[in-house]
Amino acid sequence: MARVTVEDCLEKVDNRFLLVMLASKRVKQLFKGAKPLIDNRAGNKNVVLALREIAAGKVNFEISGRKSR
């Protein structure tokens, strides 16, 4: 994946607003020292890395009893 887009992420998260919240939470985790869930040899910034992780299906979430796809 040369470029990550919102459309790539929306294949995994069906709501744009939920996607923003999920990406924000993951970026905070990365800033606090969480290990990347995908290869980051390219040295992407945390925001791009979080979106790439979501698009790759590596970030899971649950909303009040409803699990991610």
Curated annotation (Swiss-Prot):
GO terms, biological process: DNA-templated transcription
Enzyme Commission numbers on file: 2.7.7.6
Organism superkingdom: Bacteria
Entry keyword Chloroplast: no
SMART domains given in the database record: RNA_pol_Rpb6
Catalytic activity: RNA(n) + a ribonucleoside 5'-triphosphate = RNA(n+1) + diphosphate
InterPro entries xref list: DNA-dir_RNA_pol_omega, Pol_omega/Rpo6/RPB6, RPB6/omega-like_sf
Catalytic class of the enzyme: transferase
Keywords associated with the record: DNA-directed RNA polymerase, Nucleotidyltransferase, Transcription, Transferase
Subunit structure: The RNAP catalytic core consists of 2 alpha, 1 beta, 1 beta' and 1 omega subunit. When a sigma factor is associated with the core the holoenzyme is formed, which can initiate transcription.
Family: Belongs to the RNA polymerase subunit omega family.
Name recorded for this polypeptide: DNA-directed RNA polymerase subunit omega
Species the sequence originates in: Geotalea uraniireducens (strain Rf4) (Geobacter uraniireducens)
Organism lineage string: Bacteria, Pseudomonadati, Thermodesulfobacteriota, Desulfuromonadia, Geobacterales
